[in-house]
């Protein structure tokens, strides 16, 4: 069995790479994943990360080295072991990163990594369901929605932050990330929008081969 490309790891990045490569006509791609398929309902139910984090079927269950800043404790370091990788077990929070950090990368000599360079790709990747803004994208594969949770204790926390001098923001991924507000989620119609859901599943729909097992201990998807 031969492929034009073999991608090791069907995590957040691997699913994107498989999607992009398999979009090219006549190209065959093998995507290898050490974990299993993302069939568990706990993966797709947003609150299900309480079940998937720390579970050996979906999490590598890493532990950090003891650290002086933690009083020499070792803590859990969840990493996804399933299609979609950590995007299938994380808390669904969507945060792009500070523009100043990207600009500093450029200042250090990394051409193509300034905020102005990467913003078009952030916009291309997302389907933002909130208010329109120049910094936000629509029509992309990764669905990003506003948090519609209404909890008095969170509202009180936000109000306390405002009283402490923080500015309330309705879109921390917009023009200015500094402030306090509800977080945004990678979710669509009440279901988690993981990298596998956003990039891999559509890829399998428009290519002819079906996912298949290449061994009893590995579950790759080929496109």
PLM feature segments, named:
Residues 217-223:
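Hydrophobic alpha-helical segments, chiefly the membrane-spanning helices
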Residues 206-213:
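Conserved small/polar residues in nucleotide/adenosyl-binding loops
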Residues 71-192:
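Rossmann-like flavin
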Residues 1-123:
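N-terminal glycine-rich phosphate/pyrophosphate-binding loop and immediately adjacent elements
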Residues 195-196:
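Amphipathic coiled-coil/heptad-repeat helices and related helical stalk/stem segments
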Residues 15, 214-217:
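Alpha-helical transmembrane segments and their helix-entry boundary regions
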């Amino acid at each position: 069995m031969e492929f034009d490309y073999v991608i090791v790891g069907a995590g957040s990045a691997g699913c994107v790479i498989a999607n992009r490569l398999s979009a090219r006509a006549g190209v065959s791609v093998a995507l290898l994943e050490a974990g299993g398929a993302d069939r568990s309902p706990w993966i797709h139910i947003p609150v299900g990360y309480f079940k998937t984090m720390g579970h050996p079927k979906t999490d590598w269950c890493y532990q950090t080295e003891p650290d002086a800043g933690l009083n020499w404790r070792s803590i859990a370091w969840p990493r996804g072991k399933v299609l979609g990788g950590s995007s299938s077990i994380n808390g669904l929070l969507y945060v792009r990163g500070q523009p100043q950090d990207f600009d500093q990368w450029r200042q250090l000599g990394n051409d193509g990594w300034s905020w102005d360079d990467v913003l078009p790709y952030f916009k291309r990747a997302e389907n933002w369901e909130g208010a329109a803004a120049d910094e936000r994208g629509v029509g992309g594969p990764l669905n990003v929605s506003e948090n519609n949770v209404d909890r008095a204790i969170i509202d009180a926390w936000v109000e306390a932050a405002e009283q402490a001098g923080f500015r309330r923001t309705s879109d921390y991924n917009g023009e200015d990330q500094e402030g306090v507000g509800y977080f945004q989620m990678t979710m669509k119609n009440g279901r988690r929008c993981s990298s596998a859901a956003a990039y891999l599943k559509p890829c399998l729909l428009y290519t002819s081969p079906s996912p298949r097992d290449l061994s009893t201990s590995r579950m790759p998807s080929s496109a």
